[in-house]
Amino acid sequence: MAPSSQLEFNVVRKQPELLPPAEPTPFEWKELSDIDDQDGLRLHISGFFIYPPSTMSNVGRDNVARDIRLGLSKAMVFYYPLAGRIREGPNRKLSVECTGEGIMYCEADADVRLEQFGDIGALSMPFPFMDKVMFETVDDGILGTPLMYFQSTRFICGGIVIAGCYNHAIADGLGFYMFMAAAAQLARGAASPTPLPVWQRERLLSRVPPRVTFIHHEYIHDTPKTETANPLDNEPWPLHSIFFTRVDVAALRAQLPGHLRKSATSFEIISACLWRCRTAALRFAPDELSRLIIAVNARTKFGPPLPQGYYGNSIMLPMVVSEAGKLVLSGLGYAVELVIEAKGKVTEEYVKSVADYLVLNGRPHYVVTNTYLVSDLRQLVEMSKFDWGWGKPAYVGPADVGENAISFLATLKNGEEEGVVVPIRLPESAVGRFKSEVSKMVSFGCLEDVKPNRDGYLSRM
């Protein structure tokens, strides 16, 4: 069998169609929140749903497309702003015009079996079939264009991949998966989705008058004199996936001081390890600033909390900063303390201060210079929620990390061993250094790239 990265296969797409809501929906204008319309969210984000052939054996090819169309069109009745188009007003303020036009959908067929890419339950980034199962003609802009694009690709084994691409200004990742879970529920015959969607974007608008009460390093674009152009920026940054076992995490935990050894979470430990090792591998100057952003869900930080059905952007991006030399030369506990500090910043007042800062400063992009952003997706989705009547998917999550400086933690079963997989982009010249840095920090062997072995399971190289 040819290695999956070299596998040649074809995908034949049908004519894309504009899929409207199943019923007429209200025509109105809805203002997005001041968190939604920041510059860093004005882009498209993709997600994969991989259904192995074992769940699809009794499902006809036409039935799959029927179920997807039905579920998506019914879900848009409840999530009707998603069938509209985003417009920009004065001061770059975004609103959605609820036009009821709909979203884009395309069917496709692949002349290959899913298992030819390795064990389906252990597939991880980079997905070798990604480009061919994504909707082919996603508009570059976010204004006046469909808010979602979907392609369902049927493989000759009967397996299917649903690839979605959504406008990040209208929803965060949790909101997107909420919509997809609703579509699956409605396709199975539910009268309405649980939870029901809630708009309430006014709860994340800036105050009148705005008052910034925190220092928001994540949006302050000052460039210290010690930061210089990094020649690595001119190299390709291919995507790798690394796998942390429970033993690896335990080895890292053992290095922490006593007060952190029991209290630090696996996310805090892994994020700190990755930040430190990435900084060393990229060879920042000792006095250069290395930045870490931790994505924090603020839904529960409000009093009362945002409703369960809230699908707008509520992920905060608190940043901590360290001189690279201190970060690399200090023990792991130093980096873990900073991760905990970042997470602890997010309160209701912090969220309001972010909205105020964004409005006062032209809705800027978060700082990307020497920045690494980490998110925890392990609790984001429950596989059972995405059963369209065919069974649970083997994978639910992003199709790619997008930018060079973003990683997320996801649960993965590597053969018989369950652990945490983390996709990360690195310049080729830094990959060896990164692996070396991580191997120094774990007492169990050497952490390497995740790749399928001859049995299809993920293994260290």
Swiss-Prot record:
Motif position, Microbody targeting signal: 459-461
EC number: 2.3.1.145
InterPro entries: CAT-like_dom_sf (IPR023213), Plant_acyltransferase (IPR050898)
Entry's localization field: Cytoplasm
BP terms from Gene Ontology: piperine biosynthetic process
pH-dependence annotation: Optimum pH is 8.0.
Tissues with expression: Confined to immature fruits perisperm. Also detectable in roots.
A Pfam family it matches: Transferase
Keywords (A to Z) from UniProt: Acyltransferase, Cytoplasm, Transferase
Entry keyword Lipid metabolism: no
Main location: cytoplasm
Pathway per the UniProt entry: Aromatic compound metabolism
GO cellular component annotations of the record: cytoplasm
Catalytic residues (positions): H168 (proton acceptor), D387 (proton acceptor)
GO molecular function, one term: piperidine N-piperoyltransferase activity
Coiled coil location: none
Catalytic activity: piperidine + (E,E)-piperoyl-CoA = piperine + CoA + H(+); pyrrolidine + (E,E)-piperoyl-CoA = piperyline + CoA + H(+); (E,E)-piperoyl-CoA + 2-methylpropan-1-amine = (E,E)-piperlonguminine + CoA + H(+)
Classification via PANTHER family: ACYL TRANSFERASE 4 (PTHR31147), OS05G0315700 PROTEIN (PTHR31147:SF66)
Functional description taken from the UniProt entry: Involved in the biosynthesis of aromatic piperamides natural products such as piperine (1-piperoyl-piperidine), the pungent principle contributing, together with several terpenoids, to the aromatic properties of black pepper fruits, and displaying numerous pharmacological activities such as antiproliferative, antitumor, antiangiogenesis, antioxidant, antidiabetic, antiobesity, cardioprotective, antimicrobial, antiaging, and immunomodulatory effects. Mediates mainly the conversion of piperidine and piperoyl-CoA to piperine.
Family assignment from sequence similarity: Belongs to the plant acyltransferase family.
SUBUNIT field: Monomer.
Protein name as it appears in the record: Piperine synthase
Organism: Piper nigrum (Black pepper)
Gene this chain is encoded by: PS
